[in-house]
A protein has these predicted regions:
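Mid-bilayer segments of alpha-helical transmembrane spans in multi-pass integral membrane proteins
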Residues: 96, 100, 124-137, 163
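Membrane-interface helix caps of multi-pass small-molecule transporters
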Residues: 33, 100, 104, 108, ...
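Hydrophobic alpha-helical transmembrane segments
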Residues: 18-23, 50, 54, 65-69, ...
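Interfacial aromatic-anchored transmembrane helix boundaries in multi-pass membrane proteins
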Residues: 28-45, 70-105, 139-141
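Internal alpha-helical transmembrane segments of multi-pass membrane proteins
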Residues: 107-129, 185
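Hydrophobic transmembrane alpha-helices
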Residues: 2-58, 62-63
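Alpha-helical transmembrane segments and their cytosolic interface
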Residues: 2-25, 109, 113, 146-185
């Protein structure tokens, strides 16, 4: 293939990734509206996490990181939710980690559908660990408390419905992208 066509191919992929990333960012803004402002429902399904995880799989770690980092702050500017400190700030780091990990793990794991699940689960664990570290640092800076039981409750116990929901939804969407041919094996 001549160099010109390789450049066009790369440019087309960059444009597609940018457009998809914009769509995923928009989904981060509007999906929480399905909770009707209920923080209990929002915490139960964590709707902002889904587009970021999918963005990492579909567009790559760089795009996933950017969408994850921007989404909580942009959502706060538009809807005044989530509260910017400490929730939104910790969430930005968590979502950026989701985007980075899902993108990197999808790239290095075999492209069989069954490997989407370990990539997703490891990404979710890594993002939650990042969230805990950031919350711990912010608590120390703010003179408040954040201990291991608060971490386990916030990252896992209270998040069980969201974890299950993400394990069901995210792989289905990633497999749909694969089926369309956008994600190459």
């Amino acid at each position: 293939m001549p160099l010109y066509f390789e450049r066009i191919e790369k440019m087309n992929k960059t444009i597609k990734n940018t457009v998809f990333s914009a769509m995923f960012l928009a989904l981060c803004l509007v999906l929480p509206l399905i909770t009707f402002g209920s923080t209990q429902i929002g915490n139960a399904i964590s709707p902002m996490h889904i587009p970021v995880l999918i963005c990492g799989f579909v567009c790559g770690w760089q795009y996933g990181a950017i969408v994850g980092l921007i989404a909580p702050f942009l959502r706060y500017l538009i809807f005044h939710m989530p509260p910017i400190y400490p929730i939104g700030t910790a969430m930005a780091f968590e979502l950026a980690a989701y985007g980075i990990l899902s993108g990197i793990l999808y790239k290095i794991f075999p492209k069989k559908n069954k490997f989407i699940y370990p990539a997703l689960i490891i990404s979710m664990l890594g993002g939650r660990i990042v969230w805990g570290i950031v919350r711990y640092i912010m608590a120390g800076l703010g003179g408040s408390e954040f201990n291991i039981s608060m971490f386990v409750a916030g990252a896992f116990t209270n998040a069980i419905p969201a974890i299950i929901f993400h394990i069901v939804i995210v792989p289905l969407v990633v497999m749909a992208f694969k089926k369309t041919g956008y994600l190459k094996d």
